[in-house]
Amino acid sequence: MSVLRSIPFASDIIEEIAGIIGNESSTGEGTVIVFPGKRPSLYLKARLATLAGPRAFFPPRCFSLDQFIDEIARRQNPGYADIDHGDAAFILFGLIRSLGAFERHALAGKGFGDFLHWGRHLLSFIDRLDMEGIENSALVNVERNASIGYDVPQSINELLSNISLIRSEFHRVLGEGRWFTRGTKRIAAVEETGVRVPDDLRRVVFAGLFGL
């Protein structure tokens, strides 16, 4: 069961979460805390240690949101590595040069240095689609409008008019290389929790969502 609890901005969120956890910190029972970033967990653990006093203290597992997604995504993909932006852009560059749909594309005959600027934008766009869970089937309007022409260079319109093809092939190459982008990591995490919720994640407190 999901419960949404509104905490006023003037309240001490660390104190509020410590109260939600209650005595679990002394028993090691499994509440997981997810903050927008890493630092709040340090304050929470310090507060719980103070409340525990001389008793044995087992702090709850705490994650930033990105760490939480990473933890879930790697359960079925333990050997995957995070790919950096330059390497990811180079994969996109290779796809533009090798896919038949881009045989006559202006960027297909240029070097990586000429492609890198737009490659980073293309990577960011694909990553955003993945992070927001947008399926290729929903990109029909983007591709249709790009065929008519957005207010960007024609070479970029040609890329966008085939964005679903680029994205599918990009995902394929990432899978073969056992690499994660931030977006594909999110996809893997959704797939992992889509069938069932792992036993150790039955009680998760997402705290400070206003900070996202």
Model-identified regions with their sequence ranges:
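Short, glycine-/Ser/Thr-/acidic-enriched flexible segments
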Residues: 9, 39-40, 211
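Extended, H/D-rich, highly charged conserved domains that either
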Residues: 197, 203-212
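Short coil/turn segments at beta-strand junctions that form active-site/ligand-binding loops
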Residues: 25, 29-31, 200-203
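N- or domain-start disorder-to-order transition segments that initiate the globular core
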Residues: 1-21
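Short hydrophobic beta-strand that contains or immediately precedes a catalytic carboxylate
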Residues: 34-35, 62-63, 205-206
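Basic/charged alpha-beta structural segments of nucleotide/phosphate-handling enzymes
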Residues: 38-198
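Conserved RecA-like ASCE P-loop NTPase motor core of nucleic-acid helicases/translocases
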Residues: 28-40
